Amino acid sequence: MSDSPERVYPMLLDFVRKETISKNLLRVTLTGEDLIGFPEDQNGSHIKVFFPNQASGILQLPVREGDNVIWPEHKPVPRAYSVRQYRAAVNELDIDFVTHGEETPGGGWALKADIGSQIGLIGPAGPDPLIEPADWHIIAGDLSAVPAISAILEKLPSDAKGYVFIEVDEIEDIHDLVHPEEMAINWLMRNPHDTEPALAKAIKQLPSPEKATSLSAFIAGENQSVINCRKILRNDYQIARDKLYAIPYWKRGKTEEAYHDERHDVMDAVY
């Protein structure tokens, strides 16, 4: 029998500190009594974060009554993120935020966060592991996927082999990652004039791995890029569907709210 407390829905977490990882990637550390018992082995997993209402600036969290969710007057803004790391010994959770200005609910909150700042959180959730065991791995994503990619690389066995492609808009976002020696890290600069996403182009040009009896892949980031990469991996590399996890986080030109249903359609599509 577990002595862990019953999970609160959602958890209320307090700001502890923040750390700049790169020009547009900011790590925020959180804590709180609700966090006690959070699983330690879920780095990279999906979480839902609730930010203060954008009109009022007030953080009120939904409550569960039976099978129903009751939303407060000042409805919070939900966004999906990844667990970067949880340290049970000190009960601290790290979340990495992409910051492209203070007008975004998540990045804006992270930039302004200070002692006294709070958020709500539900999770973790999603597949475990994020990438399936295989002889070779292909990992690709943009800056929004770096927290999950970093967690995956840290969990892989030391003799793991494969390729990692990360697309960024600015050279200042390139930074060191902990990774197995034979996982080749490739940073790509996005060219807005390219007709084909950089990640898909890079994967298409990969040499076939020698002596590999199995391949697995993790792809995350912008919608069209994920779709293109997924198609190449399935059609050209013949990666089995259960060895490929492809998840779009966002779509260029669309807000989170406008993209929500389409995102789930992409994830649920048969490929």
From Swiss-Prot:
<dbReference type="InterPro" id="IPR017938">
    <property type="entry name" value="Riboflavin_synthase-like_b-brl"/>
</dbReference>
<keyword id="KW-0560">Oxidoreductase</keyword>
<dbReference type="InterPro" id="IPR017927">
    <property type="entry name" value="FAD-bd_FR_type"/>
</dbReference>
<dbReference type="GO" id="GO:0005737">
    <property type="term" value="C:cytoplasm"/>
</dbReference>
<protein>
    <recommendedName>
        <fullName>Ferric vulnibactin reductase VuuB</fullName>
        <ecNumber>1.16.1.7</ecNumber>
    </recommendedName>
</protein>
<keyword id="KW-0285">Flavoprotein</keyword>
<dbReference type="InterPro" id="IPR039374">
    <property type="entry name" value="SIP_fam"/>
</dbReference>
<keyword id="KW-0963">Cytoplasm</keyword>
<comment type="subunit">
    <text>Monomer.</text>
</comment>
<dbReference type="GO" id="GO:0010106">
    <property type="term" value="P:cellular response to iron ion starvation"/>
</dbReference>
<dbReference type="InterPro" id="IPR039261">
    <property type="entry name" value="FNR_nucleotide-bd"/>
</dbReference>
<dbReference type="InterPro" id="IPR013113">
    <property type="entry name" value="FAD-bd_9_SIP"/>
</dbReference>
<dbReference type="InterPro" id="IPR007037">
    <property type="entry name" value="SIP_C"/>
</dbReference>
<dbReference type="Pfam" id="PF08021">
    <property type="entry name" value="FAD_binding_9"/>
</dbReference>
<feature type="domain" description="FAD-binding FR-type">
    <location>
        <begin position="8"/>
        <end position="131"/>
    </location>
</feature>
<comment type="function">
    <text>Ferric-siderophore reductase involved in iron removal from the siderophores after their transport into the cell. Acts as a major ferric-vulnibactin reductase catalyzing the reduction of Fe(3+)-vulnibactin, a catecholate siderophore synthesized by V.vulnificus. Catalyzes reduction of Fe(3+)-aerobactin, a citrate-hydroxamate siderophore produced by other bacteria, in the absence of IutB. Catalyzes reduction of Fe(3+)-vibriobactin in vitro. No activity with ferrioxamine B or Fe(3+)-enterobactin.</text>
</comment>
<dbReference type="GO" id="GO:0140618">
    <property type="term" value="F:ferric-chelate reductase (NADH) activity"/>
</dbReference>
<comment type="similarity">
    <text>Belongs to the SIP oxidoreductase family.</text>
</comment>
<dbReference type="Pfam" id="PF04954">
    <property type="entry name" value="SIP"/>
</dbReference>
<keyword id="KW-0274">FAD</keyword>
<keyword id="KW-0520">NAD</keyword>
